[in-house]
Amino acid sequence: MPFSRRRRVVRRRKPVRRLRRRRRRFFKRAGRGSFRVKLTRFVSITQDISKTTQFSFEITPSDFTEFATLADAFEAVRFTRAKVTVLPQQNVSNNSTSLIPAYCMFPWHKELPTVATFNGFLSIDRAKCFRGTQVGIQHYVPSTLDSIQTKGAAGYEVQSVQTKYKPTIQISGGASTVVLYTGALGMQALSDAPENAQAHYNIKIDMWCTFINQTSFNK
């Protein structure tokens, strides 16, 4: 009987399965005595489509009716984020009777220039262009312009040159008139627009804020 070598059985180990570690999400809770709310404002604007038009989404706390109701019961308020929705009131655009130009949304944290072009709007970082019949949505971080002391040839001056994002505002006499900058709307001009043609837009501004340190239950 011929000699035969038994074949060695090789047992292969199954590779270790690596599980992807899930990252836990942590949500920062509002502190005791604090209250998070969403404030909303709704405005309507009309554009002469033969002219380049701009509209700032800047807002003051007094523009929200809920702010006056809540502010007296807290020490301060912090504005954390904003969402702007542009709702065109026209849903058709053609080359004869209802030609509608495009518009764009972009972040902007200071006063708008008096003269601007639509191409200038589009060159801004994070600018988004939409059809004139299309709903536009963009999120922003609210900011304020704070005054600081500067020194020039004429001596010391106070200028509003410092941008502060997600500002915390002490609730006092002037708190309701602080200007909050978020973004802006730029609307294209059409050289061949029908005479006296207009475009209409509704704008919804949602602002999230936290009222800090409740001091009273009374208005």
Curated annotation (Swiss-Prot):
Family statement drawn from the similarity comment of this UniProt entry: Belongs to the circoviridae capsid protein family.
Protein name from the UniProt record: Capsid protein
DNA-binding listed as a keyword: yes
Location in or out of the cell: Host nucleus; Virion
Chain's gene name: Cap
Region Nuclear localization signals: start-end pairs: 5-29
Source species, domain of life: Viruses
Keyword set, alphabetical order: Capsid protein, DNA-binding, Host nucleus, Host-virus interaction, T=1 icosahedral capsid protein, Viral attachment to host cell, Viral penetration into host cytoplasm, Viral penetration into host nucleus, Virion, Virus endocytosis by host, Virus entry into host cell
GO molecular function term, any single one: DNA binding
GO biological process, one term: endocytosis involved in viral entry into host cell
One Pfam family in the UniProt entry: Circo_capsid
Tagged with keyword Transmembrane: no
Binding partners and assembly: Homomultimer. Assembles in the nucleus, presumably in an immature form, then migrates to the cytoplasm once assembled as mature virion. Interacts with Rep; this interaction relocates Rep into the nucleus.
The species this protein was found in: Human associated cyclovirus 1 (isolate Homo sapiens/Pakistan/PK5510/2007) (HuCyV-1)
Chief place of localization: host cell
Function field: Self-assembles to form the virion icosahedral capsid with a T=1 symmetry. This very small capsid (17-22 nm in diameter) allows the virus to be very stable in the environment and resistant to some disinfectants, including detergents. Essential for the initial attachment to heparan sulfate moieties and chondroitin sulfate B of the host cell surface proteoglycans. After attachment, the virus is endocytosed and traffics to the nucleus. The capsid protein binds and transports the viral genome and Rep across the nuclear envelope.
GO CC aspect terms: host cell; host cell nucleus; T=1 icosahedral viral capsid
